[in-house]
Amino acid sequence: MISILGLDGFLQLVGMITIAIFALAFISFILILIISYILLKKNKLIFPSLALFLMDNLYSILLKIFLLIGTEDTFYRVGIEFYNKYYEDRFKKAKKRVLILPHCLRDTKCPAKLTPKGVECIFCNRCRVGEIIKVAEEKGYKVYIVPGSTFLKRILKEEKPEAVFGVACNRDLFYGMNMLSRKGIPSQGQPLLRDGCINTLVDVDELITRLKSL
């Protein structure tokens, strides 16, 4: 073939074939992502162990690929849904659980004080955080209201929970669940409906329902 095409022609042909293979592989990967997302919405996982490895270790690459067909926020939501589905059964079996709530769920005039273990709710009824805490504690959760990820790392070190339920914005929740997954700790997450530094919002009724059912 080299004698027919010449060296330059042969190398050009090899280059074209290589590009075609990579393009086909890339398109196939995109299709797999789309199919996986559709199945995830139907509570089905394909190749769960492989998907977990990719999500845990290659999420930055997955994000770049996902941005070709979606948004960064959508990627985080998909990741959260994946972790929720993947770890649901293990989470239900865990005995020592903690619930992590963001301090931004509080009312702007919240009288509770920040302590070394987070914000200590005084159940003043200015917001629904107290309601969430009561339900969670009845279900055996130890609850923390935290101002940032530093507190989460401290809680993991001191409490050594078997499972963690987190409430946060999509980005923080995804990275938190990703970190927990790499540590082998099953988690569940409830994204905020409205994020920001103050006056954030979560679907309290849905959160309480999940806390009771898990």
From Swiss-Prot:
Membrane topology: Multi-pass membrane protein
Places the protein is found: Cell membrane
Lineage: superkingdom: Archaea
Alphabetic keyword roster: Cell membrane, Membrane, Transmembrane, Transmembrane helix
Pfam families according to UniProt: DUF116 (PF01976)
Listed GO CC annotations: plasma membrane
TM annotation in the entry: 19-39, 50-70
Protein name per UniProt: Uncharacterized protein MJ1141
Species: Methanocaldococcus jannaschii (strain ATCC 43067 / DSM 2661 / JAL-1 / JCM 10045 / NBRC 100440) (Methanococcus jannaschii)
Lineage of producing organism: Archaea, Methanobacteriati, Methanobacteriota, Methanomada group, Methanococci
